[in-house]
Amino acid sequence: TDAADEDDFDSICAALERRGVQRIDYLVLSHYDKDHIGSAAALVRAYPVGQILGPDYEEDSMYLTLLKRAAEERNTPFLRLTENYTVKTENGSFTLDPPDIDYGDDNNNSLVTTVTWRETSFLLLGDAKKNRLNEFLDAALDSYELIKLPHHGDSNKPLLKLIAQTTPRYAAATVSPAEEIEDKLIAALA
């Protein structure tokens, strides 16, 4: 899920090559901020991609324009989701839950992704903020093995409620060395 910043392309390709990946079946983009789609156009040009999946809202962004152009050049379908989309595999599935409305805010327009692999479930929240998290609470599973925290680990009441409701065993956040995760979020995860 997601394609990081433009300058992360080489690292992404190196990771894919180490795993022997030669094709990307589904390129899932939680939303269209540059730190989530910066390398997406380059990935579409570098690898055969079966489908690009993202939320259905427009963003005036050079990166989204480049992605649309690359998808068109490579004849790669770009599905803009307005309802849940599930893909089943031999050992599991993933479900993409788009926002019910356009919140007018990239982060609140994030797709929420639930991945189930065998008996283990993961929740990837994009950069969802209060409105989007409140919307998702009713759809959440009873528990997740791992939650990828939204928006650099920013804490808010709906996120704390989601953690209490789903009791994840692990949580992951992408933060820079200058950022700290709030104490109340750490306490909720303990």
What is each stretch, according to the model?
Residues 1-190:
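Non-globular, low-confidence helical/coil segments that flank catalytic cores
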